[in-house]
């Protein structure tokens, strides 16, 4: 049969047309699959993953990866994206952190969660600021970081805000007539007490001359006697729980009736081993965590997160992960990813220059509470939780 006549028959033309249609559909489907597979949002995870503080970084790593797994794929601007977590260890070293930030920029991350510490965050922010890439720290608390660039945001309460919350409690709940502030001679404690005194003074509450002490069993009695002479109706002591136990025991033994307040370092279950329950009764601790996350929380979102975190962690058993459960900053890391993605969705873009304005005006209810940022990237109104010793146990105030 003549081949030219065969190719020109109606049957052949129809068959060839059907073949072309099927091939076109096949290629279109595969092209779309390839395109969707290539649409990726890179989220940087910069933290300390080596050395003695690696647990902080592992906490962040698991939380960020868990959030990415919950959100992927995410639809933004009419396209579906997978979230790829780009993790780098800055070793908790500011010099290394600066280099890691540059590497993150080179890899094209659209946003960054990190860094773990104040120093590493301070070193990293200028790099991200120059490239216009938002960075959200779940754990760095130095207030001086705020406003160092237009791209820095902070998920956790900062050191000034935590003191302001302590002052707010003292002013509105205690209303002391004669208060003394005591530090334990450590840098953190001295800074906290100094700022607390300033905030109280600004609100019309003058304090007695602050005390700076390094307490031991021998000195505790002498210090207590000096306090008895001063006669304060309220004592705020920024110190570890064993130091708090030693001082409050002597103060109560000599009969000084006073409100006794501490903060995070002073709240620990082991304090009941070191002091008689009668002396600890009424001891107050103001903790820089929202009620949803603080000890004994039954908040559904928090409980669900802790459950999901542990399940995800169990899937990583073969990896070199040392932590056994979520730490303090895990929820802040988790919510940081959600907030970035929420800003992208609102802007219909994964580009930093497009979504950063939505991030600045975000209003989001996360595990850590309601999330909004002020003009310098700090959380607006982050909450603290107050505990009191009642019948030999810590309970919500």
Describe every region a protein language model picked out.
Residues 44-65, 88-94, 117, 185-190, ...:
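Extracytoplasmic "Venus flytrap"
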Residues 248-334, 388-396:
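Extracellular/periplasmic periplasmic-binding protein-like sensory domains
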Residues 104-116, 136-138, 178-183, 231-241, ...:
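Periplasmic-binding protein-like
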Residues 97, 155-179, 190-191, 218-221, ...:
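Hydrophobic alpha-helical segments within soluble ligand-binding/sensing domains
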Residues 49, 152-215, 233-234:
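An alpha-beta-alpha
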């Amino acid at each position: 049969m003549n081949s030219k006549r065969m190719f020109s028959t109606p049957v052949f033309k129809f068959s060839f047309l059907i073949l072309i249609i099927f091939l076109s559909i096949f290629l279109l489907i595969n092209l779309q699959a390839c395109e969707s597979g290539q649409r990726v949002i890179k989220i940087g995870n910069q933290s300390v993953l080596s050395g003695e503080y690696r647990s902080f970084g592992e906490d962040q790593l698991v939380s960020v990866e868990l959030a990415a797994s919950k959100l992927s794929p995410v639809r933004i601007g009419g396209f579906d994206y997978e979230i790829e977590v780009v993790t780098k260890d800055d070793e908790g070293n500011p010099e290394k952190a600066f280099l890691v930030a540059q590497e993150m920029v080179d890899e094209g991350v659209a946003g960054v969660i990190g860094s773990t510490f104040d120093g590493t965050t301070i070193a990293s922010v200028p790099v991200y600021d120059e490239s216009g890439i938002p960075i959200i720290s779940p754990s760095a608390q130095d207030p001086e970081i705020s406003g160092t660039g237009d791209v820095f945001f902070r998920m956790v309460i900062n050191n000034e805000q935590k003191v302001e919350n302590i002052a707010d409690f003292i002013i509105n709940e205690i209303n002391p007539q004669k208060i003394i502030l005591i530090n334990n001679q450590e840098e953190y404690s001295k800074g906290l007490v100094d700022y607390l005194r300033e905030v109280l003074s600004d609100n019309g509450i003058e304090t007695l001359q602050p005390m700076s002490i390094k307490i031991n069993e021998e000195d505790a009695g002498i210090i207590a006697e000096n306090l008895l002479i001063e006669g304060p109706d309220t004592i705020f002591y920024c110190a570890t729980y064993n130091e708090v136990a030693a001082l409050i025991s002597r103060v109560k033994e000599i009969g000084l009736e006073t409100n006794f307040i501490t903060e995070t370092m002073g709240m620990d279950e082991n304090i009941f081993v070191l002091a008689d329950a009668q002396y600890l009764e009424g001891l107050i601790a103001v903790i820089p965590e929202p009620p949803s996350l603080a000890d004994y929380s039954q908040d559904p979102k928090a409980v669900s997160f802790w459950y999901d975190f542990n399940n995800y962690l169990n899937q990583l058993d073969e990896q070199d992960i040392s932590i056994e459960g979520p730490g303090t900053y895990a929820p802040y890391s988790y919510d940081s990813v959600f907030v970035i993605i929420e800003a992208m969705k609102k802007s219909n873009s994964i580009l930093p220059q497009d979504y950063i304005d939505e991030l600045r005006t975000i209003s989001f209810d996360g595990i850590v509470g309601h999330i909004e940022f002020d003009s310098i990237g700090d959380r607006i109104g982050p909450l603290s939780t107050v505990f009191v010793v009642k019948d030999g146990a810590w309970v919500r105030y």
